[in-house]
Curated annotation (Swiss-Prot):
Keyword annotations from UniProtKB, A to Z: Mitochondrion, Ribonucleoprotein, Ribosomal protein, Transit peptide
UniProt superkingdom: Eukaryota
GO biological process: mitochondrial translation
GO molecular function, one term: structural constituent of ribosome
Descriptive protein name: Large ribosomal subunit protein uL1m
Subunit structure: Component of the mitochondrial large ribosomal subunit (mt-LSU). Mature mammalian 55S mitochondrial ribosomes consist of a small (28S) and a large (39S) subunit. The 28S small subunit contains a 12S ribosomal RNA (12S mt-rRNA) and 30 different proteins. The 39S large subunit contains a 16S rRNA (16S mt-rRNA), a copy of mitochondrial valine transfer RNA (mt-tRNA(Val)), which plays an integral structural role, and 52 different proteins.
Gene that this sequence comes from: MRPL1
Record-stated family: Belongs to the universal ribosomal protein uL1 family.
Gene Ontology cellular component terms for the protein in this record: mitochondrial inner membrane; mitochondrial large ribosomal subunit; mitochondrion
Subcellular location: Mitochondrion
Biological source species: Homo sapiens
Annotated organelle transit peptide span: 1-50
Classification of source organism: Eukaryota, Metazoa, Chordata, Craniata, Vertebrata
Length: 325
């Protein structure tokens, strides 16, 4: 009997210890997890609602969008000139100006923009280089005397001649260099460089070695750089203004014609002289050589000029007029 009581006591003690150890373990777990917060999600991100499409509506194709753009471009022009300085360009045709009006606007732009009054004035010409079937005018370089020169420096001109008296005449008339074979050798050795080169006809055979070196500046009859009147050639090239067609674009010529502080009449006279010289390089009976002309300053936009009054007209002989009649 006593043995049975002792066994029951041991079992109760063991059970009590097991229960206490379990309680301690659970309390330790609770103390560790006090600071842990488990977020409860009470909401969800709203999903994008599908676009409501009307019955019968269709998405525009790229062709339809292009048609809409073309309709905008084809909007009829407004009548007259814009009344304000700010306007939609597509609603008005591009303005075409007389030379006097264009010069007046350039001077006005300079005042409004607070730019230099002595800035350069440029003439941009687009040319029709066609001569006939598969023939074009070659890009050319030319020198002319402007009615109102504006360059601050005189060009350096070299004169080729073996005649001692002609060398003296050249030096007296302002030639930078003058001579024969000795001058040719110095140019060949790059000891001398000039802006322009002129020659008398007798020395031309000896100049052949300089043809590639001088390139576009090589003396030619078509450029009036070969002749016997040395003072006249020097007068042209010392104060002359060079114009040339862009070799890359082949039909574009850009040149400085004046400064903005010159009078309107002086700028117009220089412009007319340049156009006359350009038109000399293509027969007049083939039609207008100059297709478009823009006048601009260093800081302004280009103003489209009315070109027809500026182009030289073909003079018909009386005999040809009778034949036409």
């Amino acid at each position: 009997m006593a043995a049975a009581v002792r066994c029951m006591g041991r079992a109760l003690i063991h059970h009590q210890r097991h229960s206490l150890s379990k309680m301690v373990y659970q309390t330790s777990l609770c103390s560790c997890s006090v600071n842990i917060r488990v977020p409860n999600r009470h909401f969800a991100a709203a999903t994008k609602s599908a676009k409501k499409t009307k019955k019968g509506a269709k998405e525009k194709t790229p062709d339809e969008k292009k048609d809409e753009i073309e309709k905008i471009k084809a909007y009829p022009y407004m009548e007259g000139e814009p009344e304000d300085d700010v306007y939609l360009k597509r609603l008005y045709p591009r303005q075409i100006y007389e030379v006097e009006k264009a010069v007046h606007l350039l001077k006005k732009f300079q005042i409004l923009d607070f730019t230099s009054p002595k800035q350069s004035v440029y003439l941009d010409l687009t040319l029709d280089m066609a001569l006939g079937k598969k023939k074009n005018v070659e890009p050319f370089t030319s020198v002319l005397s402007l009615p109102y020169p504006f360059a601050s420096e005189i060009n350096k001109v070299a004169v080729f001649t073996e005649n001692a008296s002609e060398v003296k005449i050249a030096e007296e008339n302002g030639a930078a260099f003058a001579g024969g074979t000795s001058l040719i050798q110095k140019i060949w050795d790059d000891e001398i460089v000039a802006d322009f080169y002129v020659a008398v006809p007798e020395i031309m055979p000896e100049l052949n070695r300089l043809r590639k070196k001088l390139n576009k500046k090589y003396p030619k009859l078509s450029r009036n750089s070969i002749g016997r009147d040395i003072p006249k050639m020097l007068e042209l090239f010392k104060n002359g203004h060079e114009i040339k067609v862009d070799e890359e674009r082949e039909n574009f010529l850009q040149t400085k014609i004046a400064t903005l502080d010159m009078s309107s009449d002086q700028i117009a006279a220089n412009l007319q002289a340049v156009i006359n010289e350009v038109c000399r390089h293509r027969p007049l009976n083939l039609g207008p050589f100059v297709v478009r002309a823009f006048l601009r300053s260093s800081t302004s936009e280009g103003l489209l000029l009315k070109i027809d009054p500026l182009l030289p007209k073909e003079v018909k002989n009386e005999e040809s007029e009778k034949e036409d009649a």
